[in-house]
Amino acid sequence: MAWTRDQMAARAARELTDGAYVNLGIGLPTLVANHIPDGVDVWLQSENGLLGIGPFPGEDEVDADLINAGKQTVTARAGASYFGSHDSFAMIRGGHIDLAILGAMQVTDRGDLANWMVPGKMVKGMGGAMDLVAGVKRVVVLMEHVAKDGTHKILPQCDLPLTGVGVVDRIITDLAVFDVTDGGLVLVEAAEGVGLEELRAKTGVAFVVQTRG
């Protein structure tokens, strides 16, 4: 059975390491903030100038002036800091962010990423995605395995405008987790009840299964 959006976010939260500086992309990746594992202290950064994002606020905690880059209201943890977008992008471009968890429309088995534009459709635009994939130390994609019409999102080549070439390190979907390697995709984990036959049918490229040592 496919993971729910919250289960996907919880799985992505397992990628977080203690003391890391992390940027969460708009959309599904923002849910990761609600699933940070106990004992893991991370600093979540947003392009609009906030370091130290906390979980999403409850109804009595909403501050309309405190938002992330996707214009969602957020909370700030103790020790959070606020600054201009020029400083925020300097952190990103300077290689000071350890991990970015981003959404995607298409990804290839070589780690190419398309996540900012669909021709003919209104989308929020590029935002900081190109800066993130160029400057962050590790990039994880969090997305549904296939599009709403059932077409593949993991492909040999993106047909949407690219955000970056060879930039993705790991892909987490509602069905599985893949590592992007020089030899292509390696299946690391599958959601409970999801078999290889289903994965191969819903993945637009070949992959190998990680061997357990």
Swiss-Prot record:
Keywords: Lipopolysaccharide biosynthesis, Transferase
Enzyme superclass (EC): transferase
Catalytically driven reaction(s): a 3-oxo acid + succinyl-CoA = a 3-oxoacyl-CoA + succinate
BP GO terms, sorted: lipopolysaccharide biosynthetic process
InterPro entries on file: 3-oxoacid_CoA-transf_B, CoA_trans_fam_I, CoA_transf_AS, NagB/RpiA_transferase-like
Residue numbers annotated as active site: E47
GO terms, molecular function: succinyl-CoA:3-oxo-acid CoA-transferase activity
SMART domains documented for this protein: CoA_trans (SM00882)
Keyword Ribonucleoprotein: no
Pfam families (alphabetical): CoA_trans
Annotated EC: 2.8.3.5
Pathways involved: Bacterial outer membrane biogenesis; lipopolysaccharide biosynthesis
Quaternary organization: Heterodimer of a subunit A and a subunit B.
Sequence similarity: Belongs to the 3-oxoacid CoA-transferase subunit B family.
Listed name of the protein: Succinyl-CoA:3-ketoacid coenzyme A transferase subunit B
Organism this protein belongs to: Xanthomonas campestris pv. campestris (strain B100)
